[in-house]
Amino acid sequence: MFEIHPVKKVSVVIPVYNEQESLPELIRRTTTACESLGKEYEILLIDDGSSDNSAHMLVEASQAENSHIVSILLNRNYGQHSAIMAGFSHVTGDLIITLDADLQNPPEEIPRLVAKADEGYDVVGTVRQNRQDSWFRKTASKMINRLIQRTTGKAMGNYGCMLRAYRRHIVDAMLHCHERSTFIPILANIFARRAIEIPVHHAEREFGESKYSFMRLINLMYDLVTCLTTTPLRMLSLLGSIIAIGGFSIAVLLVILRLTFGPQWAAEGVFMLFAVLFTFIGAQFIGMGLLGEYIGRIYTDVRARPRYFVQQVIRPSSKENE
């Protein structure tokens, strides 16, 4: 039996990218939710290279009287998951909660995640109820969730919601992983012994626009496919075998037709030959592109460059920069 340790301190990690409109409300509501826990807490806000006034607002929030906010400023935009990993490297709590800055997942749900974690779960995920996103975002999210479930075998309902709670040993395990393409909910479930999901409210976005454009969602899907599994390479081998068998069968058929109908038929079959040729060429290019993705990931990981660069850390206990 594993001993269940009660949560003593909660760390809330929030990546921020051009969210100056939502920051005052985010800080107020998150602080109120954490105060209601009756536990020690800290709120880590990571500025992911914002071009608006977000970074300055975070510094002011950390330097305010009786503040519980730790501001981490990255030197440029590295992406949501890299920013969260930067926050993970500075947490001091034994339960870490991730939250988006857009307030679509309300901070008021934090006490429910803490209560569920106190039951002994390593990871507490969430499922968005009455989701208030566009049809495109919902459809893309369903496709990505199904892809993840099929490739990882982990039957979690919603990997896209970042409102999640992780025990400290899960976060420490993730910090020891050095691959460049990191998808935190999946990585956490790899190390979790006990994981659960709970339904949470999902609100409309009040401030700004989503930072996930169509191309960023496509890139995310490529990242998921290439960093989670080698199944596409196996499928590519299977496709190559099918094409080889199909090509040999067509060649035999063409010889038979040539012998049966004579040379006149061969001229009329030119377009068919071109169609078959283009099919094979297309399959080859798809395979080359897929192999290139994997080789590119390997090349990036081998270089072992840092996932992010922290420019400044401002803690509430001191106004001196780290």
From Swiss-Prot:
User: Any transmembrane segments, and where?
Assistant: 236-256, 270-290
Enumerate the GO terms in the molecular function aspect. phosphotransferase activity, for other substituted phosphate groups; undecaprenyl-phosphate 4-deoxy-4-formamido-L-arabinose transferase activity
Q: Does the keyword Cell membrane apply?
A: yes
InterPro entries, per database record: ArnC_tfrase, Glyco_trans_2-like, Glycosyltransferase_2, Nucleotide-diphossugar_trans
- A GO-annotated cellular component: plasma membrane
Identify the main location.
membrane
Question: Which chain positions lie within coiled-coil regions?
Answer: none
What this protein catalyses is: UDP-4-deoxy-4-formamido-beta-L-arabinose + di-trans,octa-cis-undecaprenyl phosphate = 4-deoxy-4-formamido-alpha-L-arabinopyranosyl di-trans,octa-cis-undecaprenyl phosphate + UDP
User: What keywords tag this UniProt record?
Assistant: Antibiotic resistance, Cell inner membrane, Cell membrane, Glycosyltransferase, Lipid A biosynthesis, Lipid biosynthesis, Lipid metabolism, Lipopolysaccharide biosynthesis, Membrane, Transferase, Transmembrane, Transmembrane helix
Q: What does this protein do?
A: Catalyzes the transfer of 4-deoxy-4-formamido-L-arabinose from UDP to undecaprenyl phosphate. The modified arabinose is attached to lipid A and is required for resistance to polymyxin and cationic antimicrobial peptides.
Q: What is this protein called?
A: Undecaprenyl-phosphate 4-deoxy-4-formamido-L-arabinose transferase
Q: Which organism is it from?
A: Shigella flexneri serotype 5b (strain 8401)
